[in-house]
Amino acid sequence: MLTAIRKYIAVFGRANGGVAIVEFAFVAPVMLVLALGGVDVARYVIATEKVTKVANTIAQMISVNNMPSTTNPQYGAVNYIDLQFYHDSAMVIFPDMLADAAQQNISWTKDISITMSSVNFTTVQTNCGATCTYTPAVVWTGGDNPRPCSPALIQAVDASIPSPTTLPADVFGPGSVIVVDVQYNFHPFFGTYIPAPIGIARSVYLAPRYKPQIIYQVITGDNGIVKSCP
């Protein structure tokens, strides 16, 4: 009996017919996780590119506005109709955001935050050239999460994470700059283990192209999308 058992064990030990199945059972879950994770990584990269494109496009549309202000013709002017159009253009630039919002059963404006601002720089120094110290002041700001009118925006390292209270050091200088901040809530398809969406934030800074400054002009029917800073 003992000899028969030993012989059976020896035969079983030499058998390799089920090795592939056992190996597959170990490897399959890992491969599945990598495949699903790869899909979300690709979606994240695409979403990042689209958020950057939204910020760039809106900033460019504002910066090239050369309609003269009725109060100061040397400046360009935008009104609530212009800025509402620029804001809503995100639906065309980033249509996947609409699908994501529908999947979350929320309005698309709750899935992405778009803020548009004009910042003017001043200095009390004269004939200082490259050594001038400039103080930024928000002239107007509007959208989903307006920048604060005060205190003055803080100078930050150029590679810093975008913040509504800071500006990159490189944009400090004479004149003004248009600032567009975009924040998107990325929801992974297969990331149900992540309790909250992953935020993607991008900010773009462009100087007005044809006018020294773009001011906000209140017209009849103004919907309050923008607040002017004192």
Give the location of each predicted region.
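Context-gated lysine
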Residues: 7, 50-53, 110, 211, ...
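Alpha-helical assembly-interface signal, strongest on the long, hydrophobic N-terminal helix that forms
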Residues: 1-95
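Intrinsically disordered, low-complexity regions enriched in Pro/Ser/Thr/Gly and acidic residues
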Residues: 95-201, 205-208, 215-222
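Short, cationic low-complexity segments
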Residues: 223-230
